Structure formats: C-alpha cells, structure tokens
Amino acid sequence: MPLDRVKWRPPKQNGAVDRRVVVNPAQARELLTAVSYVGRSRGPRLRAMFACMYFAGLRPAEAAGLRRHDCELPATGWGLITLKKTRPQTNKRYTDSGETFDDRGLKHRDDDLVRPVPVPPELVAILREHLDAFGTAKDGRLFVTNGGRSFSGSAYAQVWKQARALALTPDQVESPLAARPYDLRHAAVSLWLNAGVHAPEAAERAGHGVDVMLRVYAKCIDGQRDVANQRIEDALA
C-alpha cells in the first residue's frame, strides 16, 4: 500500500504524571521561599498563590480566582477553602465579560457546585500573612498586581522560572523537577496518596474522579505493593 494512503494514528496519551516533576516537601518550601525574592512585589504577591497549589492542590486558575470570603483562616489549626469559581486566562474575544480573564465554574463540575478543600495550618499562616501584607482587590480576590489586576499566566510562569534558578541546583533546573507551577498540584496529590489518604477523599480535595486520579498519579505512588502485601498478610493471620 502506498505510504500516502496509510492512516497513522498517534498513540493515546493516558495523562499520567511523570514522577520526576514531583518535589518533596523540603524542595517545595525552598521554592516558595525563593518566589518571595523574585522582583520587588511580584514574587512576594505570588508566593501564597503558589503555596495554595502545593498545600491545597489547587489548579492555577482556581488559585487565581480565590476570594477572601472563600477562605476560613483560623488563628490556629486547619482552615478551609471553598472553591466556587476559577479565573482562567483566555482570548478576550471569547469571554463573557470581554476581559482577558473571566470567571468560570469549577472544572468537571456544574456551575452551582462548590468544592471544599481543608488546608493545613502552614498554608493558613501563609494566607493570613499575605492578607496582612497586601489585602485584596475590590472584588475580594487575593492574588492581584499592585494595580489590582490579575496576573497573566506568562507573569507567574516567569516568576516561577526565576524561583527555580534560585532554589534548585543547576542539574535540577535542567530537569523536569517542578518545571511548571502546575507541578506543585501534582506534588500535593502525590503526597496525599503516599501519606495514605483514602483515594475518594484525595479525589474530592483535588476535584478529580477517583478513577482518573489513580490513573494520572499511578507512577507517583511509592511502595503500594509492599503495603498491600502486608495488609493481605495481616488479614490472613
């Protein structure tokens, strides 16, 4: 058969996360500290946004849309973020408002549904510090520029690039390790699963279906065979 008549189909991608992108907690904290040293105000204003991706597993658009009334931030203990809207960047010709950013419902959910995400005390403290230092935009959004506008994707990607150069070794900078801000979310979900958080609970926090989550993060789960073997052995005893 002539080659020009052969139908070639690209291999299907399962969307699985490459475990090489996943940072450990020490690396994540070093990166967040490095973010605060980037620029006069851009890095300090974005540190808490990146922290939301790591400690709460938020998608970048979910963090960008976060408002003060979405956050319960007690002086001590765990807090709660209730996600209602995301703020993805797109061409302003295709938004309802005509702006570059537009409010959308949560990914994979009906517009009127919300997603509660418990947040650890470390993130609560970071968010409280952020609010003390920068306040909010007029509409309550937490993460905005000095002029009250949303950060563009290219702006926070550039901050992240500079933070990696500050926090990581030269070899790590050239590696896939935390190459994108989104990889902080991957690190969060991987940590939850490896810590033994039950899959349905981890999926609810991450805004995933259980089957999708386990497929996407299968390569990032350590030692599950040994754990399973021990549980079976204990049950047979």
Please provide the spans of the model-predicted regions.
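Short linear motifs centered on Gly/Pro in flexible linkers and helix caps
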Residues: 14, 108, 179, 222-225
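Short, basic (Lys/Arg/His-rich) helix/loop patches that form interaction surfaces
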Residues: 33-46, 56, 117, 125, ...
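Intrinsically disordered, low-complexity basic tails/linkers immediately adjacent to helix-turn-helix/homeobox/MYB/SANT
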Residues: 232-237
